[in-house]
Amino acid sequence: MRAVQAGPPLRRRHLGWWAAACGLCLSLLAGCAALDEQQRRWIFQPSDRTWAGGLAAAEGMQDVWIGFDSPASGQAVQLHGLWLPQPEPGAPVLLYLHGARWDVRGSAHRMRRMHELGFAVLGVDYRGFGRSSPALPSEALALEDAHAAWRWLAQRQPSARRFVFGHSLGGAIAVALAAEVDDEAGLLVEGSFPSIPDVVSSFRWGWLPLGPLITQRFDAGARIAAVRSPVLVVHGGQDSLIQPALGQALFEKASEPKRFVLVPGGSHHNTNALGQPQYREALAQLFGLDTLRRD
């Protein structure tokens, strides 16, 4: 009787296992890629639209275009921004980084209020927003865009004191930018958070173990200690979207000098308007900007 040769069937079986394992890995990778893409859409909600009040507030602002070659995407990028200069040559300059959903015109009212405090203001749209180059935004791409806008400001206003301002999601981008540059005069963050997992945990269903699945983490809490300039964290006392405790937690992780301002009655959207007196006081005390306009 001839012996049964087990080699080829076993080899075929091993090949089958390897094929199944490779297929599973490819499926997981595809699933991770799809999950990452959905998170980017959910977090940024990129749009070329704004609300009616934003359209009116943006009227008269100067259009600017910031071009650069993106190492992250390997493509040429054009960013659209709105520029509000000051007549005084020595005025401080503010880079405004907006949050999710609306394009930069949706933040024009905040930009004007910061302009009324004495700043020259540049607001910029990330890729995928407004008239900037089309792309699905990500944490890495948005930070790259913020760096490009910061370089534009440095070239436009080389002798001015330059500040970084971020609202909501833009606050996390502002923290990351301020942690990586060394020429900012100060960081201002309004209605922001330590990380996306922290925001998710604050929701009603936040007990679900979703943290490990979050790819777009925006870990401002881990980065803010590296910011070497003074830090102002502002939050609305009635912010129901990003809870005040999250702003306080971000503030606690920052290095001195720093200041936390809680605006009574402020929501996620009107804190900047209600908190103008607190802003003026904090800007004078923390940054020494006591010569800002008071008209």
Where are these regions (language model features)?
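Catalytic histidine neighborhood in serine/cysteine hydrolases
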Residues: 253-269
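Membrane-embedded segments
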Residues: 75-152
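Hydrolase active-site cap/lid region
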Residues: 172-223, 229, 273, 277
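N-terminal cap/lid segment of alpha/beta-hydrolase-fold proteins
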Residues: 49-87
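Short alpha-helix in the alpha/beta-hydrolase fold that links the catalytic acid
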Residues: 110, 243-252
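Acidic catalytic loop of the alpha/beta-hydrolase fold
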Residues: 238-242, 269
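Short beta-strand/loop motif that positions the catalytic acidic residue
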Residues: 227, 233-235, 239
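Alpha/beta-hydrolase fold nucleophile elbow
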Residues: 158-168
